[in-house]
């Protein structure tokens, strides 16, 4: 049945939220009945797809937690990358993923203000971004109750970036956050990524492992977001470079 329980209440709520008078009808015959049936089927198919995607996302999150030996559920992953050209217009980017996939409303960009941006020091840039992000969290939510604390931090980089991040967190008194760096192998080949934990030996995943593809997508999204923010900043400063036309530069 396509009938709605308490249609008067639903009409009232919809009218209030849209500022238009909404009238619910339930046609049994004719063109309107066909439209309602088609809409119902489309909604069911969309819900089935969404449930399937959510189930797959949950499987990937669990697989990533297992790969990193993390016991807690990964409800929020933050991925960081920085973008600049020789230190100019340096930007840090943070993207977020969770059980429902990428959470674009939670993305953040950081205009790198310190001397790091002037010298092109990638490690100092990462330290500044991490310090600003988590100093703010410590002020806004010291009890970690609002769901904005990450269950996992992923850094686009190797041992240097991971060490810089871990040391910055330690200076803030944060020693319990899960952290991993992801860097391409010596040949810079996708599929041969190495995973870096603080003061541990790097390891890799099978190139066919779905978890590896998942991490690659997260890293690529962070890279895309950081480069986009960097180019927007360059454009705003009225300085564009031929390098901006080269995919992946930044």
Describe the predicted segments one by one:
Residues 1-250:
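Acidic, glycine-enriched active-site microenvironments
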